[in-house]
Structure formats: C-alpha cells, structure tokens
C-alpha cells in the first residue's frame, strides 16, 4: 500500500471544527478532541431544540388567543371549534398576531364566529 500524507487535509479538517466551536468556553474552543465532542453534542442539541421551539411557539400562540378570547367571554377551545366548523382558515399564529396587535379586529372575528350556528 502506498503511503498517504494528509497533513494539509488534516489541518483543514481540524481548522474547520475549531472554527465551528470558536465561541465555546474554555478548552471546548481550543483543544481538538474536546472541541470535536462539543461540536457533535451541539448539533444534537440544535436538532432537538429546533422542534422544541416550534412546540414553545405553538403554546405561546394558544395562550395569547385564550387570553384575548376570554376577554370577550368565550374560551379558546370554542373559538377554534367555531372557526373549524365554519371553515374559516385562520391558523393559530395569525390569530395570535391579530389578538395582540388589533384587539378590535379579533373581537369582530369572535363576534362573527359566535353568531353563526354550529
């Protein structure tokens, strides 16, 4: 077998990993072995937290809609149910935006939905 000298390739590989972890604290940004382990762990956390943030935002939207709906004397579940039954295509994100930025418009939507018989 022929000898493979991979000095420049190995340096580039290590440099890329150390650049990736440059903002980490202590040895995790300076020593290659610990940096490589931290990099793997950070990518795993990033993957998990990507889905957790979606979950957290949905909870936030529901809380905002519920607070605005209760101000108008109706519960969150009945708002969503009425919207679904009347085929009004407003998602939770949009409803939460309307509820926080334009309370009058949200009240009009609630009034319109609650008048229609289910």
UniProtKB/Swiss-Prot annotation:
Gene3D superfamilies found in the cross-reference section: 6.10.160.10, Ribosomal protein L20
GO molecular function, one term: rRNA binding
Subcellular location: Plastid, Chloroplast
CDD domains, per database record: Ribosomal_L20
Keyword Transmembrane in record: no
Record InterPro entries: Ribosomal_bL20, RIBOSOMAL_L20_CS, Ribosomal_protein_bL20_C
GO cellular component: chloroplast; ribonucleoprotein complex; ribosome
PROSITE patterns linked: RIBOSOMAL_L20
Chief location category: plastid
Keywords of this entry: Chloroplast, Plastid, Ribonucleoprotein, Ribosomal protein, RNA-binding, rRNA-binding
Record GO biological process: ribosomal large subunit assembly; translation
Family the UniProt entry places it in: Belongs to the bacterial ribosomal protein bL20 family.
Function: Binds directly to 23S ribosomal RNA and is necessary for the in vitro assembly process of the 50S ribosomal subunit. It is not involved in the protein synthesizing functions of that subunit.
HAMAP family: Ribosomal_bL20
Protein name, per record: Large ribosomal subunit protein bL20c
Species in which this protein is naturally found: Adiantum capillus-veneris (Maidenhair fern)
Biological classification of the source: Eukaryota, Viridiplantae, Streptophyta, Embryophyta, Tracheophyta
């Amino acid at each position: 077998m022929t000898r493979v000298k991979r000095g420049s390739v190995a340096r580039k590989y290590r440099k890329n990993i150390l650049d990736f972890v440059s903002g980490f604290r202590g040895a995790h940004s300076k020593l290659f072995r610990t940096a490589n382990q931290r990099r793997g762990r950070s990518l795993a956390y990033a993957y998990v937290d990507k889905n957790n943030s979606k979950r957290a935002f949905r909870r936030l939207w529901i809380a905002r809609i519920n607070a605005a709906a209760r101000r108008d004397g109706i519960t969150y579940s009945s708002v969503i149910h009425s919207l679904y039954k009347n085929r009004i295509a407003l998602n939770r994100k949009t409803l939460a935006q309307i509820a926080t930025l334009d309370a009058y418009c949200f009240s009009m939507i609630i009034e319109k939905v609650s008048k229609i018989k289910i």
